[in-house]
């Protein structure tokens, strides 16, 4: 299929060429950039709506500022695709999120135009402030610009950074990309005029002179003068909050109108004092009708037909783990009115949108605020409710102190459904669920489970609902289940007890999580080679099933632990127990298979697990290496690379 015609964009491989264009050509460039973005993402999938919303802003920023000397930091990075196209990566834009291709987020190792990597929200202002201070210490005159969405402004970290920037009076530019119009809409020509006026040198010079005069007044009159000036501008702009944090506020302005953006950005660029916040209002999905009409459905997309907007979705062999969690929690909530659900701005991603439809008064979306979500859930638990605080593994890292201090130390029965456990594929290392088993199983009294299939997940939801003795978690991966039969309602599992799935005598494979299917496939291959193999679904990393592990250690020559997590998790706990119990003193051959001690780059999950040695082939190789043989009894094959 032929690509769209983009004659002007073809002449702009890098920002220096963009800066050479006359301003009259920039609207055409923006339209061609938008067309190229739509076409590229239609072939790869990825984050579409956010990028479409910042096309004009991206063009304006690279036209006004001297990148890469001047630093542009994109919060989260979902919106950075237009930036990548303009910064020397257009020839690879159709490799987005593919193995060996461009990252779906900003990445320092990928380009000098990406000064700071991102994928989690609300980090841009802190990073930008650090860069601005470093620039000042070095005697540099560079501009530092942090672009942050209004959604990311729900996280406390953004305000902590702004408060610090205001106190330091740092030379930092923050662009608030308000794409939900959640703060204030622009008011047409008057808004644009005021933004241009108050961002200019003349206004700011007069303002500084007035401040100097006011400083000679008694303090109570100084305060009144300052408040009068702030509230006079806030009457038009709504910027009082940001002024209180020490920022000079400009806006709101239309983020799709280059005639509005360019003069304001130039004025701010040419002003050398203090932190500035520019409030820009944009529309997610701008310029592509299907995305404008359904912004939520076009935030992250599969490959799609550009003409119809229809996304290609492969047929599912089984319901997704996320859906199974959501429907299972609904079933438990029908039997227990104390069950409530908490999400940190991810109701659809965690399956709690389904719960919210069934029980709208029992679900709480606290915004991008994982720390608050965890302690909010702890407060609910302290009053006898049963909160299920559903958070992706990678985002639970943001609330770990609250897990320790507010939940675990007080032994409060907060339930933690942990979605996106293990490798997540195209989103890469920033979103991989690698560490939760290790950091939760280290906590005294914390029950840590992992579902091996969708039926086990249903059992674990029921088990967590019934468990009131302290905090409990259960992890499960992204994607579809394996197609096992599902009970209408889960059963309560005995805490700390695993299950034997297949009996053998020579080799024992002890699986924690959904690698169970690969263990069963490996057992078939090992059996065909004359090695009778036991396969066990551990279910629990804490408490461990000590009796079962003792039996496996005493009755088998080889014991292999398999998990979808980093070093320091399930396998480490098993090895600690084996050593303490003296079970390593009899010559047992023990191997622990984990994710490698590197940040694996993005790719297809199956290929990534194979690279990690966590597929059938890797498990078989590990067993034969432990026995110093291969399938034919020859010299052992090399073991998988473990960084």
Swiss-Prot record:
Cofactor(s) the record lists: Mg(2+); thiamine diphosphate
E.C. number: 2.2.1.7
Swiss-Prot/TrEMBL keywords: Isoprene biosynthesis, Magnesium, Metal-binding, Thiamine biosynthesis, Thiamine pyrophosphate, Transferase
Pathway where this protein functions: Metabolic intermediate biosynthesis; 1-deoxy-D-xylulose 5-phosphate biosynthesis; 1-deoxy-D-xylulose 5-phosphate from D-glyceraldehyde 3-phosphate and pyruvate: step 1/1
GO biological process: 1-deoxy-D-xylulose 5-phosphate biosynthetic process; glyceraldehyde-3-phosphate metabolic process; terpenoid biosynthetic process; thiamine biosynthetic process
Subunit structure: Homodimer.
Protein name per the record: 1-deoxy-D-xylulose-5-phosphate synthase
Organism per entry: Brucella ovis (strain ATCC 25840 / 63/290 / NCTC 10512)
Gene: dxs
């Amino acid at each position: 299929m032929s690509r769209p015609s983009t004659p002007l964009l073809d002449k702009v491989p890098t920002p220096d060429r963009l800066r050479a264009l006359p301003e009259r050509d920039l609207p055409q460039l923006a339209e061609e950039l938008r067309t190229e973005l739509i076409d590229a993402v239609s072939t790869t999938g990825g984050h579409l709506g956010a990028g479409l919303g910042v096309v004009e802003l991206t063009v304006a920023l690279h036209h006004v500022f001297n990148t890469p000397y001047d630093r542009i930091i994109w919060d989260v990075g979902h919106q950075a695709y237009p930036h990548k196209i303009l910064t020397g990566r257009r020839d690879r834009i159709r490799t987005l999120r593919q193995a060996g291709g461009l990252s779906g987020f900003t990445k320092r190792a990928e380009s000098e135009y990406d000064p700071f990597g991102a994928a989690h929200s609300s980090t841009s202002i802190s990073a930008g402030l650090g860069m601005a201070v470093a620039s000042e210490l070095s005697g540099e005159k560079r501009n530092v610009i942090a672009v942050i969405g209004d959604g990311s402004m729900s996280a406390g970290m953004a305000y902590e950074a702004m408060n610090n920037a205001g106190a330091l009076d740092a030379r930092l530019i923050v662009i608030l990309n308000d794409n939900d119009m959640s703060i204030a809409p622009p008011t047409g020509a008057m808004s644009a005029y005021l933004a241009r006026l108050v961002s200019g040198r003349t206004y700011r010079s007069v303002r500084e002179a007035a401040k100097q005069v006011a400083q000679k007044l008694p303090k109570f009159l100084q305060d009144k003068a300052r408040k009068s000036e702030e509230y006079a501008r806030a009457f038009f702009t709504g910027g009082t909050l940001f002024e209180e944090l020490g920022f000079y506020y400009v806006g709101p302005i239309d983020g799709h109108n280059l005639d509005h953006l360019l003069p304001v950005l130039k004025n701010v660029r040419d002003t050398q004092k203090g932190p500035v916040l520019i409030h820009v209002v944009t529309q997610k999905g701008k310029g592509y009708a299907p995305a404008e009409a359904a912004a939520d459905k076009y935030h992250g997309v599969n490959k799609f037909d550009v003409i119809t907007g229809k996304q290609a979705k492969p047929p599912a062999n089984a319901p997704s783990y996320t859906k199974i969690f959501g429907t299972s929690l609904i079933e438990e909530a029908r039997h227990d009115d104390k069950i409530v659900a908490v999400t940190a701005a991810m109701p659809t991603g965690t399956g709690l949108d389904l719960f919210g439809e069934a029980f709208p008064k029992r679900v709480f979306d606290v915004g991008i605020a994982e720390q608050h979500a965890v302690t909010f859930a702890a407060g609910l638990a302290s009053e006898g409710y049963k909160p299920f605080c559903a958070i992706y593994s990678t985002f639970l890292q943001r609330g770990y102190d609250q897990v320790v201090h507010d939940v675990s130390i007080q032994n409060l029965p907060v339930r933690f459904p942990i979605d996106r456990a293990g490798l997540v594929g195209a989103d890469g290392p920033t979103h991989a669920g690698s560490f939760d088993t290790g950091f939760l199983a280290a906590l005294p009294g914390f029950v840590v489970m992992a579902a091996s299939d969708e039926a086990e997940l249903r059992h674990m939801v029921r088990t967590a609902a019934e468990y009131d003795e302290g905090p409990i978690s259960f992890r499960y991966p992204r994607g579809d289940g394996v197609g096992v039969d599902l009970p209408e309602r889960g059963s309560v599992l005995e805490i700390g007890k695993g299950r034997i799935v297949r009996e053998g005598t020579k080799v024992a494979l002890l699986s924690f999580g959904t690698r169970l299917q690969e263990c069963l496939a490996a057992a078939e291959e090992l059996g065909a080679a004359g090695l009778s193999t036991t396969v066990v679904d551990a279910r629990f990393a804490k408490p461990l099933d000590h009796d079962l592990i003792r039996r496996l250690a005493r009755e088998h020559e080889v014991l292999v632990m398999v998990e979808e997590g980093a070093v320091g998790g399930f396998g480490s706990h098993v090895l600690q127990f084996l050593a303490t119990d003296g079970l390593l003193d009899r010559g047992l051959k023990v191997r622990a298979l984990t994710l490698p001690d590197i940040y694996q780059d993005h790719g297809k999950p199956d290929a990534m697990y194979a690279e990690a040695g966590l597929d059938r082939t890797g498990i078989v190789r590990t067993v034969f290496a432990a026995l110093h043989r291969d399938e034919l009894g020859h010299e052992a094959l090399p073991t998988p690379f473990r960084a």
